Regions:
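Active-site-adjacent betaalpha module
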Residues: 2-13, 43-46, 50, 68-204
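Acidic/histidine-rich helix-loop elements
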Residues: 24-34, 161, 165-167
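A short alpha/beta connector and helix-capping loop motif
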Residues: 28-57
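Short glycine-rich, polar/acidic loop-and-turn segments at beta strand-coil junctions
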Residues: 41, 59-62, 97
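Hydrophobic, well-ordered secondary-structure scaffolds
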Residues: 1-26, 38, 58
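Short beta-strand segments at enzyme active-site cores
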Residues: 17, 53-60, 147
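A short acidic, helix-capping loop that chelates divalent metal ions and anchors anionic groups
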Residues: 23-27, 64-66, 155
Length: 204
């Protein structure tokens, strides 16, 4: 999706945002897009681990009544692909809002302490916590890459709003790509592009 080759910094941080079991509840969320998202996230985690780059795991602790992402709900747990790859050196950020920068511990402080200036964002939902985190990261001056095929989202409607508006998950993902790259917040890339760039540095 990019026009020029990308470079992945030696200390580029991979953010794995809200890849939690609660998002498997189709009856709760509705139709989703991109069934390959989890496979691509796993591939990126493996590449980051092999190359010794830092990984940040972000987990949403919903405060909404009845949420499948609430801490007391089984859906709060990470999906198996994350749980099986989790390492003690990974940073775990817990948040209650969309942005990963408003969580505990302080993500920006952790990145600054390690001199990290590039972030690769993956996870769920594309147009919610991934996009919000990307926008804020861009505002904070980070070089942000979003492999869109390592994210997914769900159909969305405006509920009881007067407009009766709705978009499919695929439409929302496209809107996120346009918002982020067109708005100058992040570069939209593919998992294959990122893996190729990581591989070049590993074998160099």
């Amino acid at each position: 999706m990019t026009q020029t080759a990308i470079e992945i910094a030696d200390n580029s941080a991979l953010l794995v945002i809200d890849v939690q079991k609660g998002f498997d509840a189709a009856a709760y969320w509705g139709p989703r897009d991109n069934p390959d998202a989890e496979t691509n996230i796993a591939a990126l985690m493996d590449a980051w681990r092999e190359s010794g780059r830092p990984i940040v795991l972000v987990r949403h602790a919903s405060v909404q009544p009845g949420s499948v992402l609430a801490p007391e709900h089984p859906g709060h747990a990470f999906k198996d692909l994350v749980r099986e790859r989790r390492h003690e050196d990974d940073l775990l950020v817990t948040k209650t809002v969309n942005s990963s920068f408003y969580g505990t511990p302080d993500l920006a402080a952790w990145l600054t302490d390690r001199g990290i200036g590039q972030l690769v964002l993956t996870g769920i939902q594309t147009n919610m916590c991934v996009e919000t985190t990307a926008r804020m990261a861009g505002n904070l001056g980070y070089d942000v890459l979003v492999p869109l095929d390592a994210t997914h989202t769900f159909d969305l409607a405006d509920g009881t709003g007067p407009g009766g508006l709705s978009l499919t998950a695929a439409q929302l993902a496209t809107a996120t790509a346009v918002n982020l790259q067109g708005g100058g917040f992040a570069r939209i890339v593919t998992t294959a592009e990122v893996l190729a760039a990581v591989g070049e540095r590993v074998t160099a």
